[in-house]
Amino acid sequence: MINEIKKDAQARMQKSLESLSHAFGQIRTGKAHPSILGSVMVPYYGSDTPISSVANITVKDSRTLQVVAFERNMLGAVDKAIQSAGLNLNPTNLGELLLISMPALTEETRKGFTKQARSAAEDARVAVRNIRRDALGDLKKLVKDKEISEDEERRATADIDKLTKDAEAQITKATEEKEKDLMAV
């Protein structure tokens, strides 16, 4: 019973960390990275499809992405989708592929992206704390129903607190790394 609560809390905290990592992947740094285009949806046979399903995205050099559509006739649609995605990116259509040069980040955009990163980190921290609260509530319910003793509850609470502390440390570390990437010129 206690192990199930701990495993559930750990799995949910891990999902929060993965969600944070995904959110950080969407925040553009000065370097080219395929995950920047992760949110781009391309109209494909009547439905919006993720760009990764209709094109291959590779890093040509540190500031350039190369996009090759799986179907040549889709290149125009991919081009329009990238331009209209609100990422401030302008692809260059070379007929068979698109080249996307990453514009240098201004100090203002760097600060904006840093705020965005901090906000995502705070959301992850709140999620981890909520998971902790849920797990502790489940433990209290077990004590109330006399399924576990108060000593077992204290030990389990200490374990859950350790999981929470570890998750928050990982969030802090990831946030510091992202901020360092963003502020590097």
Swiss-Prot record:
Keyword Protein biosynthesis: yes
Gene Ontology CC terms, in alphabetical order: cytosol
InterPro entries: Ribosome_recyc_fac, Ribosome_recyc_fac_dom, RRF_sf
Listed CDD domains: RRF
Disulfide bridge partners, by residue number: none
Coiled-coil region(s): none
Secretion signal, residue range per the UniProt entry: none
Domain of life: Bacteria
Location(s) in or outside the cell: Cytoplasm
Gene3D superfamilies: 3.30.1360.40, Ribosome-recycling factor
GO molecular function: ribosomal large subunit binding
Keyword annotations of the record: Cytoplasm, Protein biosynthesis
GO BP terms in the entry: cytoplasmic translational termination
Cross-referenced PANTHER family: MITOCHONDRIAL RIBOSOME RECYCLING FACTOR PSEUDO 1, RIBOSOME RECYCLING FACTOR
Protein family per UniProt: Belongs to the RRF family.
Function in brief: Responsible for the release of ribosomes from messenger RNA at the termination of protein biosynthesis. May increase the efficiency of translation by recycling ribosomes from one round of translation to another.
NCBIfam families per record: frr (TIGR00496)
Name of the protein this chain belongs to: Ribosome-recycling factor
Gene name, Swiss-Prot/TrEMBL: frr
